[in-house]
């Protein structure tokens, strides 16, 4: 059945023509119902809406008359009572309302709209004030009215002393004067005196001066002292002035509240505003939260993952452990170098656990206000108890967990220590809970308070170290899943794991991402091994500076410097395998030699001496070929490495026969007094100097023996800029000390195609071994 009702907005000429042609002349409807009136603008007020209603009525009456509608077609206009007054800004509005029959047909829908209010909006939000022209004008009007009402001088006219004397005092119209607040005189005229303003006042500088002038003026007028104009003195408190005096304070308080609300809103946690500053900023995750990281995404830290999974299993099924009398540890600290996966493990725990997971940073407990830290700790654990069983993760706990009393020589740590004390109480105090587990992450477990590490609080300390070659291979496989690689992922991961000794999980993720970016930059459809190798160089050595042009003299010096490193490393026994030598500037370095260190946890005396000799080989080569007068500053970084190794050799490893097996701290910045005598310090300095000198002379002797081979390496570098292990082997011959842990020749043969595609490396025939000098 067709709907017999027509809904339209406020009538226009086009609307009237349509009604007359389609309905009125055909006698197809009997009445018009104006259900609602809207202005569809920001100036929507009751006055404008009722004005629109009147306009609509007049328009319909004019429509019926002007269109020549017969008397029998006179149509009554029925005005509905469904009007709503709103000051809320409306952009779209509504097109009218249905008739009674249509309303009965859609009764439930209309009821819902009534509950929501006008236009379906929430009635609680109807009276939001919009910042527009009417609002500003209304505010100015209200301020003006308040000023007139509250200001005592608002209805008074200010005059000068001359006006006062000529118009009032000389004519004898002044009944009395009132000195207000010692700076203003109010003129009270005699009764019956007609004046334009009614009341007048003038300002004075001082009361004594005013009294003298008034007395002199009255004497000049011949007024006897007994008939002088009486003067009264009193103080008045202006309501407006009082309010204005509080205005700066109120403005500051309002600004603080506004900024705190914005800050809390941006943080997305805790109660808004300054009144919620003691609330915890922890974010809660549960099984309904979209966390995509799972334990399957964490690789290379199998032992730590197993420890964490044990906590999760206990919270999921505590009865399995309790039947054996076991108690879950209260907490665990995840420690290790940056980028090893501490926070990633916590994210995986949040993604796997079916219990609530609260995550917070240690720095979020500390604010500029006293007492905020302990309050947030209490609120954090109160939230955890409400959601028990629950897991709490505090990242960078060393921000609040440093040992008490440290660093207090130059300032107070009361607030941080109070926060730490509250954390200790919450973890193992009278109100502690057995179903709350606390995880914490830190890079510096050595600075934490012993009370925090004792059993009953953080029972377990899980150290997450840099992954070994097997761990790196697993991590590469995880990240290579999302990359379109040219070769088999397992083969790529195995090779890259060998090339990235000492890399953390974050470094490996960066290498994979950089490799994909390099492939995209070169318009490649797939990521090849050469792209990953370039990414490793990008991460370890820095960005290649092709725009940095060296002079021929500088380039020759850099080539001989890097050739010295390569030759020394080739003929020294305990040196890491050489992969590549380059004189292309990268980052702050003008050249570099790339080595392949193995996973090693102990260093012998011979290894330290060989490492020192190889680091000094660059300076030694410059001295051999250019003389002592032309050595450069390019070896400054090498000297720093050598000095650190020599200091550790003498003061930490106990390898110096003179100093003996005694450990001395070299870094004494945190202490005022050195823990050893001046004689001991002098002996340490002398031993370090002797050790470095011995390494220098030993390296110089080695390079002089292979001077011709060094020169050949330098010339090849000047020709090609980059040479690899196989080319060095072609020039210098087989290495005297074979690498036992891997086959370098086979490893480098897998990437020989790289040199074939590099325009800097044209193919060259192998040359016979050069005779040694």
From Swiss-Prot:
GO molecular function: ATP binding; ATP hydrolysis activity; ATP-dependent peptidase activity; metalloendopeptidase activity; zinc ion binding
PROSITE patterns noted in UniProt: AAA (PS00674)
Transmembrane residue ranges: 126-146, 239-259
Active site positions, chain numbering: 562
Binding-site residues for Zn(2+), renumbered to this chain: 561, 565, 638
Name of the protein in its database record: Mitochondrial inner membrane m-AAA protease component yta12
Cell location: Mitochondrion membrane
HAMAP family membership: FtsH (MF_01458)
Pfam family, one: AAA_lid_3
Recorded topology in the membrane: Multi-pass membrane protein
GO annotation terms (biological process): mitochondrial protein processing; mitochondrial protein quality control
Main localization (coarse): mitochondrion
Oligomeric and partner information: Component of the m-AAA protease complex.
PANTHER family the UniProt entry points to: AFG3 LIKE MATRIX AAA PEPTIDASE SUBUNIT 2, ISOFORM A, ATP-DEPENDENT PROTEASE
Role according to the record: Catalytic component of the m-AAA protease, a protease that plays a key role in proteostasis of inner mitochondrial membrane proteins. Possesses both ATPase and protease activities: the ATPase activity is required to unfold substrates, threading them into the internal proteolytic cavity for hydrolysis into small peptide fragments. The complex is necessary for the assembly of mitochondrial respiratory chain and ATPase complexes. The m-AAA protease carries out protein quality control in the inner membrane of the mitochondria by mediating degradation of mistranslated or misfolded polypeptides.
Family from the record: In the N-terminal section; belongs to the AAA ATPase family.
Recorded catalytic activity of this chain's protein: ATP + H2O = ADP + phosphate + H(+)
EC number, UniProt record: 3.4.24.-, 3.6.-.-
Key word Protease present: yes
Stretches for region Disordered: 83-119, 752-773
Residues reported to bind ATP: 298-299, 340-344, 479
């Amino acid at each position: 059945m067709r709907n017999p009702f027509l809904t339209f907005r406020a009538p226009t000429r086009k609307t009237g023509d349509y009604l007359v042609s389609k309905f009125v002349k055909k006698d197809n409807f009997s009445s018009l119902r104006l259900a609602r009136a809207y202005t569809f603008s920001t100036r929507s007020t009751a006055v404008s809406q009722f004005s629109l209603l009147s306009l609509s009525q007049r328009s319909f009456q004019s429509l019926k008359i002007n269109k020549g509608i017969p008397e029998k077609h006179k149509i009554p206009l029925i005005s509905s009572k469904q009007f709503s007054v709103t000051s809320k800004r409306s952009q779209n509005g509504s097109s009218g309302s249905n008739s009674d029959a249509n309303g009965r047909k859609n009764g439930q829908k209309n009821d819902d709209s009534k509950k929501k209010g006008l236009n379906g909006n929430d009635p609680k939000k109807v009276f939001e004030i919009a910042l527009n022209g009417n609002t500003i004008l209304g505010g100015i009007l209200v301020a003006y009215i308040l000023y007139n009402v509250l200001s005592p001088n608002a209805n008074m006219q200010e005059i000068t002393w001359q006006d006062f004397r000529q118009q009032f005092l000389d004519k004898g119209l002044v009944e009395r004067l009132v000195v207000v607040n010692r700076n203003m005189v109010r003129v009270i005229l005699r009764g019956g005196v007609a004046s334009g303003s009614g009341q007048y006042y003038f300002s004075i500088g001082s009361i004594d001066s005013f009294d003298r002038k008034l007395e002199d003026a009255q004497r000049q007028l011949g007024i006897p002292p007994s008939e002088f104009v009486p003067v009264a003195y009193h103080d008045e408190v202006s309501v407006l002035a009082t309010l204005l005096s509080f205005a700066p304070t109120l403005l500051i308080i309002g600004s603080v509240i506004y900024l705190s609300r914005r800050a809390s809103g941006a943080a997305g946690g805790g109660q808004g505003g300054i009144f919620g500053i003691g609330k915890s900023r922890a974010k809660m995750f549960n099984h309904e939260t979209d966390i995509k990281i799972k334990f399957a995404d964490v690789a290379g830290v199998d032992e730590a993952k197993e420890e964490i999974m044990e906590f999760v299993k206990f919270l999921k099924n505590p009865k399995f452990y309790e039947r054996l009398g076991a108690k879950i540890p209260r907490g665990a600290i995840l420690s290790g170098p940056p980028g090893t996966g501490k926070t990633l493990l916590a994210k995986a725990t949040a993604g796997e656990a079916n219990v609530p997971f609260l995550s917070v940073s240690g720095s979020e407990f500390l604010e500029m206000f006293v007492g905020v830290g302990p309050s947030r700790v209490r609120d954090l654990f109160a939230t955890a108890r409400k959601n028990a069983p629950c897991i709490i993760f505090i990242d960078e706990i060393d921000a609040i967990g440093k040992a008490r009393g440290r660093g207090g020589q130059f300032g107070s740590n009361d607030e941080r220590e109070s926060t730490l004390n509250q954390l200790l109480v919450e973890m193992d105090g009278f109100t502690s809970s057995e179903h709350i587990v606390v995880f914490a992450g830190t890079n510096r477990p050595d600075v934490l308070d012993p009370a925090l590490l004792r059993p009953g609080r953080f029972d377990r300390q899980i150290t997450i170290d840099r992954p070994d070659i097997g761990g790196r291979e697993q991590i590469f496989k995880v990240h290579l899943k999302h990359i379109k690689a040219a070769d088999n992922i397992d083969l790529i991961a195995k090779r890259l794991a060998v090339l990235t000794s000492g890399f953390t999980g974050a470094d490996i993720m960066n290498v994979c991402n950089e490799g994909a970016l390099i492939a995209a930059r070169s318009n490649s459809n797939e990521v090849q091994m050469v792209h990953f190798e370039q990414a490793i160089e990008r991460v370890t050595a820095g960005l290649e500076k092709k725009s940095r042009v060296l002079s021929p003299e500088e380039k020759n010096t850099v080539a001989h410097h890097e050739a010295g490193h390569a030759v020394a490393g080739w003929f020294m026994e305990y040196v890491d395998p050489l992969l590549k030598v380059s004189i292309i500037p990268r980052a702050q370095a003008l050249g570099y030699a790339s080595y392949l260190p193995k996973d090693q946890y102990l260093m012998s005396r011979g290894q330290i001496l060989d490492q020192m000799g190889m680091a000094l080989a660059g300076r030694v080569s410059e001295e051999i070929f250019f003389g002592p007068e032309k050595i450069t500053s390019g070896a400054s970084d090498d000297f720093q490495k050598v000095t650190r190794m020599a200091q550790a050799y003498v003061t930490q490893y106990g390898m110096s026969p003179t100093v003996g097996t005694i450990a001395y701290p070299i870094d004494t910045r945190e202490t005022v007094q050195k823990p050893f005598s001046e004689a001991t310090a002098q002996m340490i300095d002398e031993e370090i100097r002797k050790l470095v000198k011995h390494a220098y002379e030993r390296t110089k002797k080695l390079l002089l023996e292979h001077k011709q081979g060094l020169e050949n390496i330098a010339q090849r570098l000047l020709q090609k800029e980059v040479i690899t292990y196989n080319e060095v082997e072609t020039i210098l011959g087989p290495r005297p000390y074979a690498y036992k842990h891997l086959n370098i020749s086979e490893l480098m043969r897998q990437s020989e195609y790289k040199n074939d595609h590099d325009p800097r490396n044209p193919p060259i025939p192998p040359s016979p071994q050069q005779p040694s000098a």
